[in-house]
């Protein structure tokens, strides 16, 4: 435990020393550049006399200071590489600025690689032992996420895969547009149940549909729906008309029953007046029965009522359905009354 603490203190001391040294070199460079403008004429004259690129024939002081500054920072980076707690965060940022100044190999005594070993590179990249590097797939298409109680929508999909997702309860299903092989539609979606609510789906749509089959299907079904509506209206109208006709038929049947009852009462009254003989004869007469049947069976819809009188007996008659005019009806009814009177007289 004590050895680790001493090692940490030693590393910190080295880092501080290298940073202080680099700061001093940077200060000297600043002073040199500030006085360079005032001494520019003298330096150029000296270079012409000596025929070299420096005042004393040695290296340029600016290049020398730059080399020292870069070397100091390089040593600091090397020290930080051996110190695990800061090896992940600090060296990466410093390495980027350090590599940016490695454009000129002649002006920098330290190589851009810096003699780094494989372990130091792994530490700077943040890849430790026993860990797998993570990557994120770039999604170039438009992506939108929705939550719904059903995974179905108005498009046709084909499932092409499913896999388990880490730290989730339900698997994720992958779908593509059914018309991709025929029309090249690249729309896809991912469906997964939510862990908090298993009845809810989280649907991720990637891309847009470019197929036209769905639009054509919708266009074909739209007139079919209108036909259903029109057929329903026709059925309703036909049903209403049928009910009206049934009501009229029922009314006519009621009227026929009432007229038949009136005729039966009149016949009974005549029978009582003429005695039992005429009654028996009338009941045995086939002509009276036939005419009574004809009267009941031929009664149809009436447009108006006509009154006819035969002696002291009067009756109300309805127009027959098979009689075209009033003259035919009158002759038919007169013959009926004559037969009825002959039967009663006998």
From Swiss-Prot:
PROSITE patterns per UniProt: WRKY
Inactivation phenotype: Promotion of leaf senescence associated with abnormal expression levels of several senescence-associated markers genes. The double mutant wrky54 wrky70 exhibits stronger leaf senescence symptoms. Increase in the number of necrotic leaves and in the intensity of necrosis in response to E.amylovora.
SMART domains the UniProt entry points to: WRKY
Post-translational modifications: Phosphorylated and destabilized by ASK7/BIN2.
Record flagged with keyword Ligase: no
Biased composition (Basic residues): 121-130
Keywords, alphabetical: Brassinosteroid signaling pathway, DNA-binding, Ethylene signaling pathway, Jasmonic acid signaling pathway, Nucleus, Phosphoprotein, Plant defense, Transcription, Transcription regulation
Chain spans, region Disordered: 109-130, 267-286
Pfam family, one: WRKY
UniProt superkingdom: Eukaryota
Tissue-specific expression: Expressed in leaves.
Major localization listed first in the record, in broad terms: nucleus
InterPro entries in alphabetical order: WRKY_dom, WRKY_dom_sf, WRKY_plant
Gene induction: Induced by reactive oxygen species (ROS) and salicylic acid (SA). Early but transient accumulation after osmotic stress (e.g. polyethylene glycol, PEG). Up-regulated by E.amylovora.
Compartments reported by the entry: Nucleus
DNA-binding region: 146-214
Compositional bias annotation for Basic and acidic residues: 267-282
Listed GO biological process terms: brassinosteroid mediated signaling pathway; defense response to bacterium; defense response to fungus; ethylene-activated signaling pathway; negative regulation of leaf senescence; regulation of brassinosteroid mediated signaling pathway; regulation of defense response; regulation of ethylene-activated signaling pathway
A molecular function (GO) term: DNA-binding transcription factor activity
GO cellular component, one term: nucleus
Family: Belongs to the WRKY group III family.
Subunit annotation: Interacts with WRKY30. Binds to BZR2/BES1 to cooperatively regulate the expression of target genes. Interacts with ASK7/BIN2.
Function, as annotated: Transcription factor. Interacts specifically with the W box (5'-(T)TGAC[CT]-3'), a frequently occurring elicitor-responsive cis-acting element. Together with WRKY70, negative regulator of developmental senescence, probably via the regulation of several senescence-associated markers genes. Positive regulator of EDS1-dependent defense against E.amylovora. In collaboration with WRKY70, prevents stomatal closure and, consequently, osmotic stress tolerance.
Protein name as catalogued: Probable WRKY transcription factor 54
Species, as recorded: Arabidopsis thaliana
Source taxonomy: Eukaryota, Viridiplantae, Streptophyta, Embryophyta, Tracheophyta
